[in-house]
Regions:
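Acidic, metal-binding active-site segment of PIN/NYN-like and related structure-specific nucleases
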Residues: 114-144
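Conserved beta-strand -> loop -> alpha-helix junction used to position metal-binding or nucleic-acid-contacting
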Residues: 27, 132-133, 137-142, 149-158
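Non-catalytic nucleic-acid-binding/docking modules located in mid-to-C-terminal regions
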Residues: 150-280
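Short acidic loop-to-helix transition motifs that present clustered carboxylates
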Residues: 108-113
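A short alpha->loop->secondary-structure connector
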Residues: 40-46, 141-149
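A polyampholytic, Gly/Pro-enriched intrinsically disordered region
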Residues: 124-132, 148-151, 164-167
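Charged, low-complexity C-terminal accessory regions
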Residues: 67-79, 126, 136, 261-263, ...
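Noncatalytic, basic helical substrate-engagement surface that gates or grips nucleic-acid strands
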Residues: 1-107
Length: 280
């Protein structure tokens, strides 16, 4: 809990230092098509949690001489089993309001909203580790943010498509056919999808790759088309009443952070990025 608040605070402070205006977008209820993926992720998380505690027991019982490798493995597992509760989410929203950072509360999943904001120039890029952002057609996706090094990797989808020699429709069809969060059961192997795409190109047909795969009976029509529909952002609208904005409050922000173990030095506080603290 403390690490979550500290991490978000440090990230926003770094954004402000580089004059980056951030908008946080919170998920709503996922579509029913994602239920299988959600259940699968819960199972993976439970298995990782069990492995984490088994490894911890080995280290505590000192049954192994070299524990460095196990400790590194534990850190990887710990990140996999992190759970963000509704209470955690509310505390993050409170922090954002106190720092004067805007956020948007989605009715459904946030991916389509993030993609739409970038596509309509309401945002420059989307910071996310979710690969589905590419399938939505998000022009710029930021990944691998390092607060320690102040670095991030930017993916430009137009440059990617140019390098790959693909249209966006081809790229989207390949990704969906290979399996997205919405059609895992109907997916085919990625390499198989690429091999079939080569045959599709060689055929010289004018239909889309996805339609060609359906015609050849390599893909379930309903599952594929439903997944493609879910990645369509042309119908998306930004509901202004879901945008939460605040001017921030430094005094209340300081009080809030102190409850999480932040200790502040004496300074003339004029903005949130100048709050100097020592964290224990």
């Amino acid at each position: 809990d403390n690490m979550l608040i500290e991490g978000i605070y440090q990230m926003i402070s770094q954004f402000e230092y580089y004059n980056i205006t951030s908008i946080f977008v919170f998920d709503g209820k996922p579509p029913v098509e994602k239920n299988d993926v959600i259940q699968e992720r819960r199972l993976v998380k439970r298995e990782a949690e069990q492995k984490y505690y088994d490894t911890k027991d080995l280290i505590e019982k000192k049954e192994l001489q070299d524990t460095c490798t196990l400790k590194r493995e534990m850190e990887v597992l710990r990140k996999k089993i992190v759970k963000v509760s509704k209470s955690d989410t509310q505390k993050v929203k409170q922090l954002l309001s106190l720092m004067g950072v805007s956020y948007y509360e989605c009715d459904g999943e946030s991916d389509s909203i993030c993609a739409f904001m970038v596509q309509t120039n309401q945002a420059y890029a989307c910071l996310s580790e979710d690969m589905d952002l590419f399938v939505y057609g998000t022009r710029r996706v930021l990944r691998y943010l390092s607060l320690l090094k102040s670095t991030v990797v930017i993916y430009d989808i137009e440059g990617m498509l140019l390098t790959l020699g693909l249209t966006f429709k081809d790229f989207q069809d390949i990704c969906v056919l290979s399996g997205s969060d919405y059609n895992k059961k109907d997916a085919i192997d990625f390499n198989c999808s690429l091999n079939m795409f080569t045959k599709y190109r060689e055929s010289g047909v004018i239909t889309s790759y996805g339609d060609w795969m359906i015609e050849k009976k390599h893909m379930d029509s309903d599952g594929f088309k439903r997944a493609i529909e879910l990645f369509d952002i042309s119908h998306i609208t930004i509901e202004r009443d879901r945008f939460i904005k605040s001017d921030g409050n430094n005094n209340k922000l300081k009080e809030f952070l102190e409850t999480y173990g932040f200790i502040f030095g004496i300074s003339n506080i004029k903005d949130t990025s100048s709050l100097n603290y020592i964290k224990f």
